[in-house]
Design a protein with these regions (language model features):
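Cleavable N-terminal export/targeting peptides
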Residues: 1-35, 234
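Transmembrane beta-barrel domains of Gram-negative outer membranes and organellar outer membranes
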Residues: 28-234
């Protein structure tokens, strides 16, 4: 119980203390395990591949793979597949279009995205869901310290509407090593918290990330995740 409480305090301090320092900050970077999006897209005529694998409490697991390409100068399209190995065996696909409204020229930027997704649960197909999101990013302290914020609207299962939000912070300890923390919601229940570390195996090309997270006030909803982001230079 003491360890569980300590972990929750660590998450809370990581997110809210950083947010208190960072109300003007964000460095856009590859974080394949974070749910909070940033206001950047892949470079023009380039692609990126992100994948993640989560080990969930109770023996279940889930994975996701998402390739994304910038088809022009300011229009990124991504296709995703995700699946969970548990009693329900949920799996599904998603497609997202994203564009930058204000580039990160100075200390902040804004983007918009629209995602369409569909899940299948125990051979039962759900309706097509859609999610409109507005990511904002801010830079501070020579782009080493940062903040991403998301606010969006989701039309989910059975056409249930939901205002979704997310706050993520990150700090670059060096050119290769960084730490991140975030809090976000996905439904009308308690929000989630997550802390991550990432390491650039190949600078600006290959990033490895590890994270731990849980839903607040829900001891059984915890996970450990591994993520990989690959951005080829060609």
């Amino acid at each position: 119980m003491f360890l569980h409480a300590s972990i929750q305090w660590y998450y809370a301090l990581s997110v809210f203390l950083l947010c208190g320092v960072l109300l003007l900050a964000q460095k856009s970077k590859a974080d394949p395990l974070l749910n909070t999006d940033d206001a950047s897209i892949t470079a023009a005529h380039h692609c990126q591949l992100e994948s993640s694998y989560l080990f969930l409490k109770g023996g279940a697991s889930s994975y996701q793979i998402t390739p994304a390409c910038n088809l022009g100068q300011n229009f990124e399209v991504s296709l995703g597949y995700h699946a969970t190995q548990d009693v329900d065996n949920v799996h599904g696909f998603s497609v997202q279009a994203k564009t930058v409204l204000k580039p990160m020229d100075n200390r902040w930027g804004v983007a918009t995205s629209l995602m369409l997704s569909r899940d299948e649960k125990s051979q039962q197909r759900s309706d097509l869901d859609w999610f409109f999101n507005v990511p904002m990013s801010f830079n501070l302290i020579d782009q080493r310290l940062g903040l991403n914020t998301n606010i969006g609207y989701q039309d989910g299962p059975d056409h249930a509407s939901l205002i979704r939000w997310g706050i993520a912070t990150n700090y670059s300890l060096s050119d290769r090593f960084g730490v991140s923390a975030e809090t976000y919601n996905q439904d009308r229940q308690a929000p989630f918290i997550q802390a991550a570390v990432n390491y650039s195996l190949i600078p600006n090309t290959l990033v490895l990330e590890a994270a731990i997270g849980e839903r607040l006030h829900a001891f059984r909803q915890r996970w450990f995740g591994l993520g990989l982001s690959f951005t080829p230079s060609f």
